[in-house]
Amino acid sequence: MAGHSKWANIKRQKARVDAKKGSLFTKLSRAIIVAARNGLPDPDGNFQLRAAVEKAKAAGMPSENIERAIAKGAGNWSDDSPLEEVRYEGYGPGGVAVLIEAMTDNRNRTAAEVREAFSKTGGSLGEAGCVSWLFRQKGVISLEEVLDPEALLLAVAEAGGDDFKVEGTGAEVYCDYSLLEQVATYLKKEGYPVQDAAIRWIPSTEVHVEDPDTAKSVLALMERLDNLDDVQNVYANFEIDEAVMESLA
């Protein structure tokens, strides 16, 4: 998906800037807290936590920050404002479906910020369930580099995965979310450079955005939402042709 590939590149570039101002660390810390709270507070026995910790380390988060986040998730750190996971749904410009995962200590603040992001870009925040039926949860393993797609196809099948999609010089491998750890572990064992492994919402249908102005508004919405400290992940079902993306560059 050209549009999604472009947005992924923008996010990677923005992450380097976010790391400097600390907002990336906030998001990574919250992911660790929730992973530790939902399972064992030990990365060796909690795949979700191990993946979150590895991602934090790759971003350069200090060890003491990681340890503090794990302690918070385990309930061993006093915190007057506990975090809770919330999900928002809405429609962006051109009828694009948008699903947002957030972690917040203040639902009212986060809802207001998300609503403003939609309204500023021509979208609208909807009710729970208005677009989630257009997505399905899948395990997604991001590989940094793939030299032989045919060999990867065989490895994915042997690991228990469903499919993969080449993204630039790398690839994204898809599997049942219950098999995420199994597939990621197998690919690592086979020498594949696993960059990330997470459960994501994958759109079952896509909206093709052909108008440049609409495409610009969609990307503006994605960026506004991703810039919010409380927002962890943003998913959308847009497809933007490469020619349209190039016209916006």
Curated annotation (Swiss-Prot):
| A GO biological process held by the record | regulation of DNA-templated transcription
DNA-binding as a keyword of this entry, yes or no, is yes
| SUPFAM superfamilies xref list | YebC-like (SSF75625)
Highest taxon in the source lineage: Bacteria
Entry keyword set: Cytoplasm, DNA-binding, Transcription, Transcription regulation
Under the heading HAMAP family, the entry gives:
Transcrip_reg_TACO1
Name of the molecule in the record: Probable transcriptional regulatory protein CYB_1350
Q: What is the species listed in this Swiss-Prot or TrEMBL entry?
A: Synechococcus sp. (strain JA-2-3B'a(2-13))
